[in-house]
């Protein structure tokens, strides 16, 4: 989208922004509570309220008001008090789900851009869900030229703890950038592999994975 509008946007920008964006949300898979508790705690507006110093509050929205005006209206209308009433049923406080900006769960956001010989232009990792013991690891490279071959290797136990599954040619210039859900799910469902291997791909990862 940025390219179509002639806007220069590189991976390093996302790395820089995430290093300054505090990790505030205690929701699975990286946190403790199911996703519906994010709604109970106030959802996206609560996050916006915590990070509003980083936002352009003067932008116009579909309500006909600016973002800043929308956030003020929520406070005036008792939105956050209503959210706390949901959490009261579980004996929780909002801070159990969404931390204040100055008391975050972490200070490095949720993703990072990695660079190396396998991805010289950069690769994205959601580091908040990576086991700490895997931050530094030496793994065996197991390359596959399509997702189907990788799934078969996982399901037939060809992949062992200590392997790095590499799936190539699944990007936008390959097969159209399909979601790598099935391989991810096969790995996560295996008690031996879930926290002991890595998956690198030019394919797509979205909410499901």
Model-identified regions with their sequence ranges:
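Catalytic or ion-coupling anion/metal-binding cores of large enzyme and transporter domains
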Residues: 1-209
